[in-house]
Amino acid sequence: TDKDGALDELFKIKEEGLAKAVGLAMGRIDIMFPILKNWDFDVIINHNRYTLLNREADEMYSYAHSKNISIFNAAPYAGGVLAKGPSNFKKITYQDASEEKLAPAREIERVCKKYNVEMGAAALQFSMKDKRITSTICGVTSVQSIEKNLAWAKTDIPEEFWNEVLKLPFSTKDPESERVYTAG
């Protein structure tokens, strides 16, 4: 981010017509948002910070949208728990989660069961229905998971469901703040 650094060079490449767009991709909002405010990016990708469980990226997404920056929201399933359900998958954003940390996901699961809505459909459409978000990026591991994502994207979800699920509490803290990274 220094003058004459990598970002300067990327924007020069765009000015010279060698690239059509310059984007910024990262997880940590505390690093990403200040960079975003100081450069004229065309697109951003952020992951795990705008889900049914977490809205840490909300302010940054509003800012980016106001600047006509395309927003790609990745990992709408919070690392899998919102696709598989907290009864089957006891991790949030790739980390083992205590019962206390799983409680908000269990509340979402409860509302999903009440309205007969699959959690994955709710999580995916939460991102897809946000007008600020240009596209939602989902990790897939097989043809079956692609088919499931496509089905979830087309699922009819009643407005009553959204009215209830959007009233549930959510975090605005970095969901990976306690994540331990190991080499290899």
What do the PLM-derived regions correspond to, one by one?
Residues T1-K167, S171-T172, E178-G184:
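Beta/alpha (TIM)-barrel catalytic core signal, keyed to glycine-rich beta->alpha loops juxtaposed to Asp/Glu
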